[in-house]
Regions:
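Generic protein-terminus/edge-of-domain signal
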Residues: 1-57
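Short histidine-centered beta-strand/loop micro-motifs
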Residues: 38-45, 85-88, 105-108, 135
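Short beta-strand segments in beta-sandwich/barrel cores
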Residues: 40, 55-61, 74-75, 83
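A generic beta-sheet turn/junction motif
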Residues: 46, 62-64, 89-91
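Short acidic-glycine-tyrosine-enriched beta hairpin
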Residues: 64-79
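Ligand-binding loop in jelly-roll beta-barrel domains
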Residues: 80-110
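Double-stranded beta-helix
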Residues: 101-129
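A short, Lys/Arg-enriched amphipathic alpha-helix from helix-turn-helix/homeodomain DNA-binding modules
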Residues: 138-173
Length: 173
């Protein structure tokens, strides 16, 4: 899925800082960025991360497992789990940071998750109006719906449907 583009640090624009603290007073923090190709060094957070892209693909290495995050799926990273990521092409990044308390109701292991149309719409709306910490009553209600959608998201073991071709089946087993 990745092209032959080779990342060279000298050609890279300045890296967006990896947050070391965010306002989780409401339990949720919404992050949205347009990211140029980059490599994000190994790090961990005290909060959980629901990572989603509206454009592009990001490769994440989480606890010894590799995940791809295309626009059809999100990747869940529990609190305090070391991870790093690479995006070889520009991406439109959306992330919901969840407090450790809220994260405790989500999977204990990193996993891919579905993104409902409702959740996608809320994350896009918050990006368009730059909501990071919901401030108004409508924003707080939307944030609660986003949380409900994250909690209800299906965990996905494989991004691709199983092959139907007899020629492909041996390669995928």
């Amino acid at each position: 899925m990745f092209s032959d583009i080779r990342l060279r640090k000298a050609d890279m624009p300045p890296k967006v800082a990896i947050p070391t603290s965010v306002d989780l007073s409401q339990g949720l923090y919404f992050r949205h960025l347009a990211l140029e190709p980059d490599t994000w060094d190994a790090h961990a957070h005290d909060w959980g991360q629901f990572n989603y892209l509206t454009r592009g693909v990001m490769r994440l290495e989480i606890a010894g497992r590799t995940f791809l995050s295309p626009p059809h799926y999100a990747v869940w990273i529990p609190p305090k789990v070391e991870h790093f990521s690479v995006n070889e092409i520009p991406v439109s990044y959306r992330s919901v940071y969840l407090s450790a308390e809220i994260s405790s109701a989500l999977p204990a292991q990193a996993c891919a998750m579905t993104v409902s149309a409702v959740l996608r719409a809320i994350l896009d709306a918050f990006s368009n109006i730059d909501v990071r910490v919901p401030a108004t009553a409508p924003q707080k209600r939307m944030a609660q719906v986003a949380l409900d959608e994250i909690r209800a998201a299906t965990h996905v073991d494989a991004y691709l449907p199983p092959p139907s071709s007899d020629l492909c089946k041996p390669c995928c087993n």
